[in-house]
Regions:
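Short Cys/His-rich zinc-binding micro-motifs
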Residues: 1-9
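Cysteine-centered loop/knuckle micro-motif
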Residues: 13-15
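Short Cys/His-rich micro-motifs in 6-15 aa windows
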Residues: 17-25
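Short, aromatic-enriched amphipathic alpha-helices that serve as compact interaction elements
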Residues: 26-40
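Short solvent-exposed beta->alpha transition segments
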Residues: 49-78
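Surface-exposed, charged secondary-structure patches
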Residues: 67-98
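Short beta-strand edge/turn micro-motifs at domain boundaries
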Residues: 103-105
Length: 105
């Protein structure tokens, strides 16, 4: 299976090792790709575990899992990687009302 993060790699060779805790994402880009894949699969455990502790109070693991399930995750575009600890990205998805959405950070 191709990895949902749009890396053109197989899931088993890309984001799956992060999702199974075999490896930890070494860069902000790898972390972002793994989180996008976790929404697409979905994997609420991984999403909660990789959410900043200060932000965990805003969502439950179940809510993250559901958000992954109710949306169709189309594409992740890496816009800029200024440093290993920063990434600018665009996540494209279709929401539960069939509206195209773009999340840009």
């Amino acid at each position: 299976m191709n990895c949902p993060c749009c890396s053109n790699k197989l899931y088993a060779e890309c984001c799956e090792p992060y999702h199974t805790k075999e490896k930890y994402a070494p860069t902000a880009e790898a972390l972002m790709r793994s989180r996008f894949s976790a929404f697409a699969i979905p994997n609420g455990d991984y999403l909660m575990n990789t959410t900043l502790p200060a932000k965990r109070k805003f969502h439950t693991k179940e809510e993250l899992q559901e958000w992954g399930e109710i949306n169709q995750w189309i594409k992740l575009e890496i816009v800029n990687v200024p440093t290993m600890n920063q990434v600018e990205f665009k996540a494209y998805y279709i929401d539960q009302d069939q509206n195209e959405q773009l999340h840009h950070e």
